[in-house]
UniProtKB/Swiss-Prot annotation:
Catalytic activities: Release of protein hormones and neuropeptides from their precursors, generally by hydrolysis of -Lys-Arg-|- bonds
Glycosylated sites: N375, N514, N524
InterPro entries per the UniProt record, alphabetical: Galactose-bd-like_sf (IPR008979), Kexin/furin (IPR034182), P_dom (IPR002884), Peptidase_S8/S53_dom (IPR000209), Peptidase_S8/S53_dom_sf (IPR036852), Peptidase_S8_Asp-AS (IPR023827), Peptidase_S8_His-AS (IPR022398), Peptidase_S8_Ser-AS (IPR023828)
Disulfide partners: C225-C376, C317-C347, C468-C494
Pfam family, any one: Peptidase_S8
Effect on the protein upon substituting R430W: No effect on secretion; no effect on proglucagon processing
Signal peptide range: 1-25
Domain Peptidase S8: 129-453
GO cellular component term of the entry, any: extracellular space
Protein name (database record): Neuroendocrine convertase 2
């Protein structure tokens, strides 16, 4: 599988993004879903055309004039049988375009079978929910948890917030979920009806979404199962995984479903975590994401939470275009004693972590939540379990301040996540150029619900975001078999222009590169302030020698808050003893952030916090620059 972006950068809904394109050696699989555009006429005309040809139809909320036609009578993945229907649409003079959707794989993450407190709940599994309040259960480390108790004691339980679980459906009749189910915001895109109930199987395979829903919104004090992180929030089911193949139109429709009712979208799935796939959202889904962060929640932006991936040390989540998107909050996991789970992927785009299991055989070390048939389970695991926990914490923060934007939530995540007692056996904890501590696997640390809601209460919306192409290397450069190819780009970050980026949020290195063995490539990038981001680690199972990376946007959050101006360094080399060849064809530096200091106007209540440190840094920088401007002015007068 090959992934990348088309050569031009497109502007959609006020955001720059590259349209990812993918090529595969496998024969394409065609589905019973069509993207249709009419020459003229609105939704009524589309319904008329669809009915005449035996199709159902849905209007796409994020794209004017485009419709989703689906034909339940067509056998899925049968090109020959669907050809007649495709030709009928194409011959219809009212139809401008009829694009049959290709199918591709999307996998649930973490579907694995794993072998005294101030807040009292009568739910039978509550005392086993160590990730909520860790007192040392299942040989865990006391105090290593989400600190939800502090948020609850402050009165925040997720009331007024709706979380959409994009998955294989949820059992909305489950007695621990029924009272918090938001039917109006729910839909089944696999069956095209408003009832996202999971398809029961003998192996309980479709319990994934129900388990995720319980982590977020399971009711409290009802003597059933456990308690959700945001137990007074509402949960919506968006069923979209349970079909032979995924399509761009189903993903885009799910991600853009009811953006004025759904505040947070939780996704515990993605491309196959096999250590050799490079894949991400297609054009419609990218457009839907851009539309969501720009227009969702009344313009404050939909909040997308993504599981970082379960490929372990054999994979890298920067090869997953969902987890590495600027528009998602990518969440990794730790187990109850602070160690990494064996399936955890590391990458520079991960923003923070929550909890799951994947290392201990103790049956009570898993995540306790709701299950199919009205049951409960202690065996939920993977980063699948981590993402909904984060969605629950964000729901608590939104209740504290409904005015938070999608970017505010990312800033709060960076500032309130904590190292706590997390331990990465491979990558050390480091500080970036403005003193923020981060880890290549855990991001900025484990979420702290108490700290987040307290900061959210006083939070002022961060300044406007700008985008700058910091420079580009277009001449082909050979990567040596031993040693490294080292390139530099010096940028002023568009200073003096209206899109000047002074304080960084996200940085993308858009790279085109080929190698005799793609999985042996290692790519690092160092910022002007000296922060090294590992953009790509070795993936020993990836033996691709033909397609490489084509305009692939590797992303880092590790330079958050830094000054973008200066010299950036890119290093490419091979890991392993076998002789290798490679060619870097392009490196384009994309800078995203603000012109004005994002924390200057924020209220500081904890003078030991990262916010206090960052604000002090900003004030000193602003003072230094003011002095420099004054000196220049005096010298110019003389």
């Amino acid at each position: 599988m090959k992934g990348g972006c088309v050569s031009q950068w497109k502007a959609a809904a006020g955001f720059l993004f590259c349209v990812m394109v993918f090529a595969s050696a496998e024969r394409p699989v065609f589905t019973n879903h069509f993207l249709v555009e009419l020459h003229k006429g609105g939704e009524d005309k589309a319904r008329q055309v669809a009915a005449e040809h035996g199709f159902g139809v849905r209007k796409l909320p994020f794209a004017e004039g485009l419709y989703h036609f689906y034909h339940n009578g067509l056998a899925k993945a049968k090109r020959r049988r669907s050809l007649h229907h495709k030709q009928q649409l194409e011959r219809d003079p009212r139809v401008k375009m009829a694009l049959q959707q290709e199918g591709f794989d999307r996998k649930k993450r973490g579907y694995r079978d794993i072998n005294e407190i101030d807040i009292n709940m009568n739910d039978p599994l509550f005392t086993k929910q160590w990730y909520l309040i860790n007192t040392g259960q299942a040989d865990g480390t006391p105090g290593l948890d989400l600190n939800v108790a502090e948020a609850w004691e402050l009165g925040y339980t997720g009331k007024g917030v709706t979380i959409g679980i994009m998955d294989d459906g949820i059992d909305y009749l489950h007695p621990d979920l029924a009272s918090n189910y938001n039917a109006e915001a729910s839909y089944d895109f696999s069956s095209n009806d408003p009832y996202p109930y999971p398809r029961y199987t003998d192996d309980w395979f479709n319990s994934h979404g129900t388990r995720c829903a319980g982590e977020v919104s399971a009711a409290a004090n009802n003597n059933i199962c456990g308690v959700g992180v945001a137990y007074n929030s509402k949960v919506a089911g968006i069923r979209m995984l349970d079909q032979p193949f995924m399509t761009d139109i189903i993903e885009a429709s799910s991600i853009s479903h009811m953006p004025q009712l759904i505040d947070i979208y939780s996704a515990s799935w993605g491309p196959t975590d096999n250590g050799k796939t490079v894949d991400g959202p297609r054009e419609l889904t990218l457009q839907a994401m851009a539309d969501g962060v720009n227009k969702g929640r009344g313009g404050k932006g939909s909040i997308y939470v993504w599981a970082s991936g379960d490929g372990g040390s054999y994979d890298d989540c920067n090869c997953d275009g969902y987890a590495s998107s600027m528009w998602t909050i990518s969440i990794n996991s730790a187990i109850n004693d602070g160690r990494t789970a064996l399936y955890d992927e590391s990458c520079s785009s991960t923003l923070a972590s929550t909890f799951s299991n994947g290392r201990k055989r103790n049956p009570e070390a898993g995540v306790a939540t709701t299950d199919l048939y009205g049951n409960c389970t202690l065996r939920h695991s993977g980063t699948s379990a981590a993402a909904p926990e984060a969605a629950g914490v964000f729901a608590l923060a939104l209740e504290a301040n409904l005015g938070l934007t999608w970017r505010d939530m990312q800033h709060l995540t960076v500032l309130t996540s904590k190292r706590n007692q997390l331990h990465d056996e491979v990558h050390q904890w480091r500080r970036n150029g403005v003193g923020l501590e981060f880890n290549h696997l855990f991001g900025y640390g484990v979420l702290d619900a108490g700290a987040m809601v307290k900061m959210a209460k006083d939070w002022k919306t961060v300044p406007e975001r700008f985008h700058c192409v910091g420079g580009s290397v277009q001449d082909p450069e050979k990567i040596p078999s031993t040693g490294k190819l080292v390139l530099t780009l010096t940028t002023d970050a568009c200073e003096g222009k209206e899109n000047f980026v002074r304080y960084l949020e996200h940085v993308q290195a858009v790279i085109t590169v080929n190698a005799t063995r793609r999985g042996d490539l290692n790519i690092n990038m160092t910022s002007p302030m000296g922060t090294k981001s590992i953009l790509l680690s070795r993936r020993p199972r990836d033996d691709d020698s033909k397609v490489g990376f084509d305009k692939w946007p590797f992303m880092t959050t590790h330079t958050w808050g830094e000054d973008a101006r200066g010299t950036w360094t890119l290093e490419l080399g091979f890991v392993g003893s076998a002789p290798q060849k490679g060619v870097l064809k392009e490196w384009t530096l994309m800078l995203h952030g603000t012109q004005s200091a994002p924390y200057i106007d924020q209220v500081v209540r904890d003078y030991q916090s990262k916010l206090a440190m960052s604000k002090k840094e900003e004030l000193e920088e602003e003072l230094d620059e003011a002095v420099e401007r004054s000196l220049k002015s005096i010298l110019n007068k003389n």
